[in-house]
Each structure stands twice: as structure tokens, then as C-alpha cells.
């Protein structure tokens, strides 16, 4: 049996302000730092250890991984960063307040933008200063690979090649793997691993900073999955994520 640990980054400044974040590179709040440290303490207390870590190129996930590994005295572990683990791109909504958008467009429309599988938000214009196409961290990519908006279907298509080419082979080779990423890149992995339907994935929410453990069989098919720590607290945190887009 293999294990995979997934951690959504701790609370970010724009989580706190209830803004659509996407690829905008905001930092952790003090609460987010503490959530990341607590994840590390919890993993250490439960006897977890790792050989290899993966994260995105966005600082809220990277720093979550740092703090988690620091609490485990594993800051020396090899870490692979990939843009493919970035958050879903929220297009023209990036930087806007979710509740304000719900008041303007209605809860149902914001839910579609936030959680629907195949409906992206309005796209950024390529010349919009919020676009990441001129960001040096994506300089090795073809501009067409740097999105101007994404739906979850797009995020799944972006994340799965990295799973298939990097993460899954590492697990199958016997490496103990932790992934620190984002709500929607983790939802993309959850959808794939659990075979969740396009409709059902709308109801899946991932709380900040709580380790999600997958136990996998020899073919990397899930045996079971669970959040470490207080299950009730994890459920409440996931419900709070679900409520962010309401007026």
C-alpha cells in the first residue's frame, strides 16, 4: 500500500479578504503560517515522513510546504516546483471580492464561476496588468500555456500530466510523497483519483492547511482517504470554503 499526502496552502491574504486569487502570487497570513506549522506538527506526531515534496510556483503553497517541513525537521528534502500545480486561473475575477460579485451577479452565477466543472470565468485580456504572461517564472512556457482564465476541466488537463509524469512514478518507485498545492489543483487530483463525476465535484471543498491522506493500492487506486486530526474541524473548515462565494 502507498500513501499520498495532499495539503492545501494555509490561509492567504486574499483568502482573508475573500478575493478570487488564482495565479496572483499573494502571501500567507499569520493564521496561514500557523496552519502550515500545525500540519507539520500533526504529520510528525502521526509518524509520517517523506522522501520527496512537490509544490506550485506560488509563494502561498511554497511557504506552506516550508513551514510544514520545518516542523518535521525535513527542510532538506528535495522539492520540485511546477506551474502545473498552480491554482486554477480565475481570469477577470482575480482580485475581486467573492461576496461583492455574488451581490452583483447572484450566488448561483458565482457558484458556477467558482465550482462548475466546465464553465470558466470571463477571461483576462492578454495586455491586462493582472496577466502572468510576462512573469519571469513562466518564461520557459509558450504564452498559450499561461492561461487567461480556466475552468476546473482546464485545471485537470493541466495537472494530470504532472501526476502521470512525475508524482505517480515517484510513488510507485517507493518514494513517500507530500504535495502542497491549492484548492482547485488538489480538487483536480481528487476528481481523478476518486473518479468523481463532473457534477459531483462541484460539492467538493478542500480546507486550508489540513493534511489529506490517500491510501492507494498497487495501481494507485484509492483504498480510502481521510483528513488528519479532528474530522469535525476539517468538515467545518470545508463548509466555510463552500460559503465564501455567497452574498
Curated annotation (Swiss-Prot):
UniProt keyword Isomerase, yes or no: yes
GO molecular function: phosphoglycerate mutase activity
Catalysed reactions listed for this entry: (2R)-2-phosphoglycerate = (2R)-3-phosphoglycerate
Residues reported to bind substrate: 8-15, 21-22, 60, 87-90, 98, 114-115, 183-184
Matching InterPro entries: His_Pase_superF_clade-1, His_PPase_superfam, PG/BPGM_mutase_AS, Phosphogly_mut1
The entry's keywords: Gluconeogenesis, Glycolysis, Isomerase
BP-aspect Gene Ontology terms: gluconeogenesis; glycolytic process
Protein name: 2,3-bisphosphoglycerate-dependent phosphoglycerate mutase
